[in-house]
Amino acid sequence: MIQQETRLKVADNSGAREVLTIKVLGGSGRKTANIGDVIVCTVKQATPGGVVKKGEVVRAVIVRTKSGARRTDGSYISFDENACVIIRDDKSPRGTRIFGPVARELRENNFMKIVSLAPEVI
């Protein structure tokens, strides 16, 4: 579960390495986000020469969480880290590569470009 002030690793090559959550989108009183949810973030660490700069406010979709997510068959999926992918307004990723596995829940939320770029879908 991701909430305000949570720091996440960025799992793409957009230039950002770490982001800080500002807001969870999807409802006025929504406090937490899980895999497949869109959040508003600020870039805290960035690589030189990247598309995204430090201090920039961006939107991102969560692709991995430590707390895990419950699936419809009753199983749970969890990862070793909290990670996100920076996206544009049309849900397409700003980077051209995705690093590490992503959860299958992204396919249900119509993030097909991220699913197709990912090396592994769990």
From Swiss-Prot:
It comes from the Bacteria. Signal peptide: none annotated. It comes from Bacillus velezensis (strain DSM 23117 / BGSC 10A6 / LMG 26770 / FZB42). One of its GO terms (biological process) is translation. InterPro entries: Ribosomal_uL14, Ribosomal_uL14_bac-type, Ribosomal_uL14_CS, Ribosomal_uL14_sf. The keyword Transferase does not apply. HAMAP family: Ribosomal_uL14. Binds to 23S rRNA. Forms part of two intersubunit bridges in the 70S ribosome. Belongs to the universal ribosomal protein uL14 family. NCBIfam families: rplN_bact. GO terms for molecular function: large ribosomal subunit rRNA binding; structural constituent of ribosome. The keyword Membrane does not apply. PANTHER family: 50S/60S RIBOSOMAL PROTEIN L14/L23 (PTHR11761), LARGE RIBOSOMAL SUBUNIT PROTEIN UL14M (PTHR11761:SF3). This is Large ribosomal subunit protein uL14. Part of the 50S ribosomal subunit. Forms a cluster with proteins L3 and L19. In the 70S ribosome, L14 and L19 interact and together make contacts with the 16S rRNA in bridges B5 and B8. The gene is rplN. SUPFAM superfamilies: Ribosomal protein L14. PROSITE patterns: RIBOSOMAL_L14. Keywords: Ribonucleoprotein, Ribosomal protein, RNA-binding, rRNA-binding.
